[in-house]
Amino acid sequence: MRQLWTQAAVIALTAGTLGAPAHASGQSGQRFTPNFPITQPAAPPPGETIQAQPGEAESLPRPTPIPVQSAPPIAQAELPPPAPVSTPAPAPQPVLRATPPRTVVTTTVTGPVVEVAGKPQVRVVESGDALDAIARGMGSTRAELVKLNDLEPPYRLKLGQKIKGPATTAKAYVVQTGDTMFAIAKRFNVTAAALAEENDLKSGAAIKKGQKLLLPDGYKDKGPIKTTQVIPGTPATMVAEAEPAPATTRPATPAATPSRPVRQPVSEETSEPATTSTTTLSVTGSVVTVAGPRQVHTVKSGDTLTAIARKFDMSVSELAEANKLDTEKPLKLGAKIKGPATTQKAYSVQTGDTLGEIAKRFNVSVKALAAENNLRATASLKKGQKIALPDGFRDKGPIRTTTTTRPATPPANTYARVDSSAAAASTPSSPVPYTPSGAAPRPSAPVAAQPITPPPSSGRTIIETAAAPTEAEIIASGKGKFAWPLRGDIISSFGVKGTGQRNDGLNIRAPQGTPVLSSADGEIAYAGNQVPTFGNLVLVKHADGWVTAYAHLSSTNVKMRQQVKQGEQLGTVGATGGVNEPQLHFEMRYAPTVKDKAKPVDPALVLPR
């Protein structure tokens, strides 16, 4: 029982203690809520009453009030700002760059032309020649020729005797560093062979700076050679920047999803590829002075030997000797008195020249040129042969043929990387979670910049092949391998001949039955007459992709698969296939590979001159 009273006293004491702060602070009606749990004692069972003993409660000490102060509010501590995050400098990003085309001009063969002592003049005595006439032709005098040749009176000349004249002056070119015989010949509009022959050299002979090269007769100085080359620019390609951007320091932010380069078409002007112009010269021989036909006087009534000698500017003795006449006897009416030989201009033939081409250079007809030289219009010519030029000729200079080739234009890169600022502008402002593809895992590190490759086309597969050879390269590859199948007048040259018409070869006029020879070693690929308009036709397949064709033959001497050598007869000239006169249609074709279609090539640019 005592224990129960003790518990009741503790409860009352506790209640008084909890109520004291409210009265002490002067705030009634507001209770302080403890911040610890309170466990209430179990309630006494119903019906049981606990009564305190008299005097026991009074004997307990009265509790003293405890002063309570309100705790100050707890200040919320401010967190320090996050430490700045140093972002490393990004890897060099690819940028779109292109090089514009540029023009390069180089000047060569810049040496001066000087005057030097030329070779002495030489005249071979022919029938009817007189010393005085030879002296006049050389621009000299009888006395000078007598001294130069140690002649003695009465100064009789013998057939075939060589009479030396005074030395002439000539023009020469002073060689500069890097000059070649071919480049010098090009400047002075002559052939390298003619230039070498004039200087007793070989065409490919080495020359030194300061060396003087005599210039052949008929040269034309076109001045230093200027070569202009357009170097094409490079198409726009992705390249890494030369210097990476400096590192930046910024507050840490949520990592953004790495962006990828976006391929977009770029409208880009394609640079013009370099063009190559090949100029070839033909009929490049020199014009020389040769002995012309002798003057002839027909004796008329009253003529005397003295009067005729005066007309020919000869002495009576020279005229009598040249015609085997007796000065004491009278002349017969109608007799032909031969005077001194005249001089005239002639063209010195070079390899590959024809009467037709020579006539074109000197602005005369083939018929007149052939008649002046007692030749047929289709006659073959030899190097060094002198072709007399008819009266009224006009020298237009060597024939120039210019061929312009343009290499294939490389495909331009039409894809470029979109600028990062533009890509950022289209990025949503709210974060978008990145969902990696199952096929390609998300990269965990920056990806190195790679060149952007255009996506494959949906059309046919494109197979990359080596660039096709240019026309100049094709011509160079055939030089020195082929020979003319025959010689004659070219009546139709290579190229376009009118609206819708084109000649893929050369038509060479020649007499019926003239042998047609193989241009080079090879195998007979075709021999027959089944190709319309070509008549009897022979095709020869050669090494390195070359094929030659020989059409309008009157007969053929070969069969399929037969091996032939250069110069071996294939057939004879005819007029089969619808042509109206005997001729040979000759073609040269080239194919880089067996899969390529053979392309016609101008034989005049490949065959020797």
UniProtKB/Swiss-Prot annotation:
Residues 79-93 have a biased composition (Pro residues). Residues 503-603 are annotated as: LytM. Residues 1-24 form the signal peptide. The keyword tRNA-binding does not apply. Its main location: periplasm. One of its GO terms (cellular component) is periplasmic space. Residues 242-258, 265-280, 400-429 have a biased composition (Low complexity). InterPro entries: Cell_wall_metabolism_enzyme, Dup_hybrid_motif, LysM_dom, LysM_dom_sf, Peptidase_M23. Residues 25-38 have a biased composition (Polar residues). Residues 21-103, 242-280, 389-457 are annotated as: Disordered. GO terms for molecular function: metalloendopeptidase activity. It is found in: Periplasm. Disruption phenotype: Deletion mutant exhibits morphological defects, including cell widening and filamentation, and cell division defects. Inactivation causes severe defects in outer membrane invagination, resulting in a significant delay between cytoplasmic compartmentalization and final separation of the daughter cells. Cells lacking the gene also show outer membrane blebbing at the division site, at cell poles and along the cell body. It comes from the Bacteria. GO terms for biological process: cell division. Residues 121-165, 171-215, 295-339, 345-389 form the LysM domain. Keywords: Cell cycle, Cell division, Periplasm, Repeat, Signal. Required for efficient cell division, cell polarity and normal cell morphology. Facilitates remodeling of the peptidoglycan layer and, thus, coordinated constriction of the cell envelope during the division process. Plays a critical role in maintaining proper cell envelope architecture during growth and division. Required for normal envelope invagination during cell division and to establish or maintain outer membrane connections throughout the cell envelope. May serve as a regulatory hub coordinating the activities of multiple peptidoglycan-degrading enzymes during cell constriction. Composed of four peptidoglycan binding (LysM) domains and a C-terminal lysostaphin-like (LytM) peptidase domain. The LysM domains are the major mediators of the localization to the division site, probably via direct interaction with peptidoglycans. The LytM region is dispensable for localization, but is essential for function. This is Cell division protein DipM. It comes from Caulobacter vibrioides (strain NA1000 / CB15N). The lineage of its organism: Bacteria, Pseudomonadati, Pseudomonadota, Alphaproteobacteria, Caulobacterales. The gene is dipM.
